[in-house]
Amino acid sequence: MPSILLLGSGFVAHPTLEYLSRRKENNITVACRTLSKAEAFINGIPNSKAIALDVNDEAALEKAVSEHDLTISLIPYTYHATVMKAAIKHGKHVCTTSYVNPKMAELEEAAIKAGSICMNEIGVDPGIDHLYAIKTIEEVHKAGGKIKSFLSYCGGLPAPEDSNNPLGYKFSWSSRGVLLALRNSAKFYENGKLVEIDGKDLMETAKPYFIYPGYAFVCYPNRDSTVYQERYQIPEAETIIRGTLRYQGFPEFIHCLVDMGFLDETAQEYLSPEAPALPWKEVTARVIKAESSSEADLIKKISSIHKFKDEDDKKRILNGLKWLGMFSSKPVTPRGNPLDTLCATLEELMQYEEGERDMLILQHKFEVETKEGKRQTRTCTLLDYGVPNGYTSMAKLVGVPCGVATQQILDGVINTPGVLAPNDMKLCGPLIDTLAKEGIRLEEEIIDEE
């Protein structure tokens, strides 16, 4: 009887739990810091039990891991290496949806020696994106073709009808991580040249990206795309860019917040949680160093530190800042620094309301040179909506692949020990097939150029 330990009870974990509970032989233990939370989480789910576990207690964590065949780690990625060490020590397996970081990668030799399978990067991005990238690249190479360009963009967004705020974005989890990602620098290949973009300039590089006529997407690059030349075995590719999709208007608004200093984590006494809560207009004035907190002075200062594209852009962004309350007398929720204080307001105003749904869009676009020297464009596209008052698209598309990979480890389909991620068709093929049965697949299209 396979035994599974599920660490975490976030929104992604429930689709994982539901998928694995379909197999009657699986015994699933859900661990949370408080027993009541774990019990509420498994309510109505067969063959599951709840335990209280503090993952900061390494001895208790190791004991729990050692008592199960496989541990699913859906807690913050900083804990994954600790979970993997405990599993490897006892010859057990692990599954995560996170990128393999250096601390995880260095456990490769120990995992192989112990016969432990530590599967990672099996959500949507990373995860489903890898599956179809590997599939397409292998198909092209087997046919004697070359990948000349690889573009991959993904966005978790509100459905168009629910994108009703100045950012066209909503938070289903902490806004802090979303905003911090906007400060990351980017590195990619474009037309054979290495391009590097500083984090502060990232939003300026955003440009329209066409997938379907009904959606106004913009794209910008993510972190280091250059590593995928080797990982995906496409040394011939002159352009390799992985990036993020947002609705139009998002980058300009974020760029203004960056210029104003609201993505800054520097502690400020006047934003201390112990200090009296100041009105928003006073905080805005202090952060941007305006002459006063009057709306006229705030707008004057913002106009001097941020270059608006045109008058329409200026009007839209200033209206957005007003919508957030940044020129108002409403007290802020002080969280120590400008970034976290802004996050408190974003999380208050930009949550999904009851009955609203999210959307996930993912597309790979390959420019291919065939064996015969002809050009073709290949696309793999996923457009998925959440269910109002049910699973979000993001939860399903991260949680179900994690559940599928877990089951394939237990069934012996994934059977190579080590620290793994989807890197070849031996791993990717069965995952693609099983996910398709769950209704999770990318639509593939080939357009031959004359």
UniProtKB/Swiss-Prot annotation:
Provide the alphabetized UniProt keywords: Amino-acid biosynthesis, Cytoplasm, Lysine biosynthesis, NADP, Oxidoreductase
Can you list the disulfide-bonded cysteine pairs? none
Q: What is its EC number?
A: 1.5.1.10
Fetch the Gene3D superfamilies from UniProt. Answer: Dihydrodipicolinate Reductase, domain 2, Domain 3, Saccharopine reductase, NAD(P)-binding Rossmann-like Domain
* Catalytic class of the enzyme: oxidoreductase
List the transmembrane segments.
none
Q: Among its keywords, does the record have Metal-binding? A: no
Q: In which pathway does it act?
A: Amino-acid biosynthesis; L-lysine biosynthesis via AAA pathway; L-lysine from L-alpha-aminoadipate (fungal route): step 2/3
What GO molecular function terms would the record report?
A: saccharopine dehydrogenase (NADP+, L-glutamate-forming) activity; saccharopine dehydrogenase activity
Q: One Pfam family, please name it.
A: Sacchrp_dh_C
| Binding-site residues for NADP(+), renumbered to this chain | 9-12, 32-34, 54-55, 75, 97-98, 124-126, 174
**Record text on subunit structure and interactions:** Homodimer.
What family is this? Belongs to the saccharopine dehydrogenase family.
Q: What is this protein called?
A: Saccharopine dehydrogenase [NADP(+), L-glutamate-forming]
The organism named in the record is: Schizosaccharomyces pombe (strain 972 / ATCC 24843) (Fission yeast)
The organism's lineage?
Eukaryota, Fungi, Dikarya, Ascomycota, Taphrinomycotina
Gene expressing this chain: lys9
